[in-house]
Amino acid sequence: MKSDLDGYEVRIKSLENQTAHYSEQALLEQEQRVLASLREITQNVIAMGQENSLVEIKGELESKEESELVIDPSGFQEKIDTFVELVELLKVTHLEQETLDNFLRYTISSSNLLQINSVQDAKYVELESQVKELEQGTLESHKREIEATKGQIKNLCQELSMAQDSINETFLDTSNALEECDALLNELTQLRMEKQTSEEADTIEDDPVSQTYEDWESLQKSKLELRLLEEETSRLQSRVESYEDYQKRSRQLSNNDPRMLQNHKALELLVELWMTKFLPQPGISHLELFPQSRKFQFDVEPTFTVVITLADQTTFQNVQVYRKDAKSLVMDHGLNDEIKNSYLGTNNIYNGLNDIIHTLQRRVQAKGSN
């Protein structure tokens, strides 16, 4: 499988190299054609400059590179103006020479002399008109040929430019396609590596030694949790025993001390007030208050014992939920975290207690239905 990918990679690299080579060759040929055209234009202008002083190249061409330079057109306007003036002067001179020629021709005695008395003569005007028509016709013919040639050159240049653009676009599209193939090949290689890694991981997971080690780690973690729960249970049992001793001493003292008896009755009335006014939900029992530690606890029969610590008069500081078993109380961590996340920090103690009791009663009912 890897050899197949290597073969594809070699072919893609080969195609990329060929594409780059042909693209560079095409660009080089295009550049050479442009330079050849510029060289030909420059040579034509040089030849014109040698034959006509109106077209000149300043300075001498000392090297081959300088002979390929494009003519500086900055002085063309001045040359054009001079050329126009010279053409007008040539026209006037031509007319003068033609007039003189006609004058000499027709004033000298001859058997075929034309009777032309002046430039305003009808015969002279007619001949001049014919000459201008012939001249204009010849000029128009040459102009049409020049325009047709220019149009052909323009069309050929456009076709050549379009062909060059098409070649460049083809090379560009080919390069993009090869880059996409290369990216897909890399992605395929990555996916195969991930698949191989996943298969190796599955093999490792099926290894009995690794599984045994993971089970051992899980057992150690469970033992640690059990030890923590046993310590928590021991602390709660010590608290219950201390509370029972306190109640026992309170009863003994209350029999002898009227003040203690009065406080005990007030505490019982306070518990009854909480049971009737602040905890209206049925199904709770064994409400106990601990004013000094700001704690109180109650049972949601027959499964849960709840211990709540108040931060102030309106806020829960801590909530602990324990499950009852035959001998001790065991903290239900999952349920405890759920209730903490939902009600810890609530600003309404009454609604918070109401919701906690509802939640625990639903758990009791769900367990009973199962």
Curated annotation (Swiss-Prot):
This is Outer kinetochore KNL1 complex subunit KRE28. One of its GO terms (cellular component) is kinetochore. The keyword Nucleus applies. Acts as a component of the outer kinetochore KNL1 complex that facilitates microtubule-kinetochore interactions and the spindle assembly checkpoint. Kinetochores, consisting of a centromere-associated inner segment and a microtubule-contacting outer segment, play a crucial role in chromosome segregation by mediating the physical connection between centromeric DNA and spindle microtubules. The lineage of its organism: Eukaryota, Fungi, Dikarya, Ascomycota, Saccharomycotina. The gene is KRE28. The keyword ATP-binding does not apply. Belongs to the KRE28 family. GO terms for biological process: homologous chromosome orientation in meiotic metaphase I; regulation of meiosis I spindle assembly checkpoint. InterPro entries: Kre28. Its main location: nucleus. Component of the KNL1/SPC105 complex composed of SPC105 and KRE28. Part of the ten-subunit outer kinetochore KMN network that includes the KNL1, MIS12 and NDC80 complexes. Pfam families: Kre28 (PF17097). Residues 115-249 form a coiled coil. It comes from the Eukaryota. Keywords: Centromere, Chromosome, Coiled coil, Kinetochore, Nucleus. It comes from Zygosaccharomyces rouxii (strain ATCC 2623 / CBS 732 / NBRC 1130 / NCYC 568 / NRRL Y-229). It is found in: Nucleus; Chromosome, Centromere, Kinetochore.
